Amino acid sequence: MSETDFEYMFFLGCIAPNRYPGIESATYKALDKLGIQLHPFEQASCCPAPGVFGSFDLMTWLTIAARNIVMAEQADLDILTICNGCYGSLFEANHILQDNENARNKVNEVLSKHGLEYTGKSRVRHLTEVLYFDYGTEKIAERVERPLDINVAVHYGCHYLKPTDVKHIESSEVPKSLDGLVEAIGAKSIYYKDKNMCCGAGGGVRARNPEVALEMAETKVKNIIAAGGDCVTEVCPFCHLQFDRGQIEMKETFGREYKLPVIHYAQLLGMAMGMTPKEVALDLHFIPADPLLEKLGINME
């Protein structure tokens, strides 16, 4: 694929623009440097979260998701997401509607009242999937201006690779894509205990039982620190929130303090391509990235 083939409707989701706008801006800036063109959704809604909407009414979830997908269809583009939850919701809704004519007809009956029709011609893609499998780590490495000589703990999250009956991207037990992307920018992807464990944010756990959610996140943070990780990188703003804001909540709830920097891959990529930490908004995180920047010899500005 040539770089001219990389053009997408960019689905932001809710958490990035509302809680971590730096992830949004870093994605635009970093992908622009790679020659990947992103078009903003003009009237996107929540993806919506299937664990919330779908648990109450499956057709409502499918219809809202379909409306988002239709906007990409109208632009004749695929969707790119930077959030595992948005990816999971839109991908799975797309899969159901493509394969289930009855569901598709019911959804289109509602959409037709607004002059819309779902056809199923647009794909839903994840940032990690596109960068690793389509764009390629060799091309990314060629764009690196500042190799990041740090130990990075990769967190894949749950909804990027699961459920495996509909997502056939790579092994959900031994994934390699995000590790490869980290290595492409000069960093070392380290192994740590329970690497594939959930961060605790999803499935309604953070909302319903926050202490259990924090215990899950704390387990991962402790394992990463024990393995010598300089930071944790993820590809989901909700996971990012769980690790970043979560460390503040761990101190408030358990009285235990951690200072593990949390950085979305788009932010790491941007820094490796010469952007300052402030340009990728590391200064807006709850957990300061100072120890990481000191190791890299980079100033915030």
Curated annotation (Swiss-Prot):
What Gene3D superfamilies does the record tag this protein with? Answer: 1.20.1050.140, 3.40.50.11810
UniProt catalytic activity: coenzyme B + coenzyme M + 2 reduced [2Fe-2S]-[ferredoxin] + 2 H(+) = coenzyme M-coenzyme B heterodisulfide + 2 H2 + 2 oxidized [2Fe-2S]-[ferredoxin]; coenzyme B + coenzyme M + 2 reduced [2Fe-2S]-[ferredoxin] + 2 CO2 = coenzyme M-coenzyme B heterodisulfide + 2 formate + 2 oxidized [2Fe-2S]-[ferredoxin]
Q: Keyword Nucleotide-binding, does the record have it?
A: no
The UniProt keywords, alphabetically, are:
Methanogenesis, Oxidoreductase
What's a single GO BP term from this record?
methanogenesis
Keyword Oxidoreductase in annotation: yes
Q: Which pathway?
A: Cofactor metabolism; coenzyme M-coenzyme B heterodisulfide reduction; coenzyme B and coenzyme M from coenzyme M-coenzyme B heterodisulfide: step 1/1
User: For this protein, what is any one GO molecular function term?
Assistant: CoB--CoM heterodisulfide reductase activity
Question: From which domain of life does this come?
Answer: Archaea
Task: Write down the Pfam families for this protein, in alphabetical order.
Answer: CCG (PF02754)
UniProt EC number: 1.8.98.5, 1.8.98.6
What InterPro entries does its record include?
Answer: CoB/CoM_hetero-S_Rdtase_bsu, Cys_rich_dom, HdrB/HdrD_reductase
NCBIfam families documented for this protein: CoB_CoM_SS_B
Biological function: Part of a complex that catalyzes the reversible reduction of CoM-S-S-CoB to the thiol-coenzymes H-S-CoM (coenzyme M) and H-S-CoB (coenzyme B).
Query: What family is this protein classified in?
Result: Belongs to the HdrB family.
By what name is this protein known? H(2)/formate:CoB-CoM heterodisulfide,ferredoxin reductase subunit B1
Native source organism of the sequence? Methanococcus maripaludis (strain DSM 14266 / JCM 13030 / NBRC 101832 / S2 / LL)
